[in-house]
């Protein structure tokens, strides 16, 4: 399948949700794809323990250096301070290196996250 069509299809699918934020989470130390999956699964469990109704999709991307990963997320129902609190408390990174932007629906989910999926690193959805 053509990557442009694939990205557009993912964007349309993820665009059905009314997201609150687009976030980029950066690690303090290098993390492999496998380790990133473990940390992102823990973040998901943390949200569940907070007993909040939420939706999330995250995509992993390699840093330009190729030695570590970082994650891009779309979230709904999650206060970004909760993300930063978890990230710092778990010693994964500093909140000043995390980036949170209010989701602008008119840009579409493909603008925010679908473009990373075709890099075929790793991704996960919850609640959608």
Model region roles, listed by residue range:
Residues 73-74:
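Long, low-complexity, serine/threonine/proline-rich intrinsically disordered regulatory regions
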Residues 70:
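Conserved, short, structured surface segments that act as functional micro-motifs
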Residues 1-67, 77-128:
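Right-hand nucleic-acid polymerase module
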């Amino acid at each position: 399948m053509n990557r442009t069509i694939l990205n557009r299809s993912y964007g349309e699918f993820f665009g059905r949700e009314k997201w609150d934020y687009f976030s980029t989470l950066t690690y303090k130390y290098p993390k492999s794809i496998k380790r990133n999956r473990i940390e992102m699964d823990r973040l998901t469990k943390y949200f569940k323990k907070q007993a909040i109704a939420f939706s999330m999709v995250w995509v992993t991307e390699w840093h330009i250096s190729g030695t570590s990963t970082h994650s891009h997320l779309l979230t709904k129902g999650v206060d970004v301070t909760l993300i930063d609190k978890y990230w710092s408390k778990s010693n994964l990174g500093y909140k000043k290196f995390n980036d949170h932007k209010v989701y602008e629906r008119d840009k579409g989910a493909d603008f925010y996250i679908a473009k990373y999926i075709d890099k075929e690193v790793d991704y996960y959805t919850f609640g959608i």
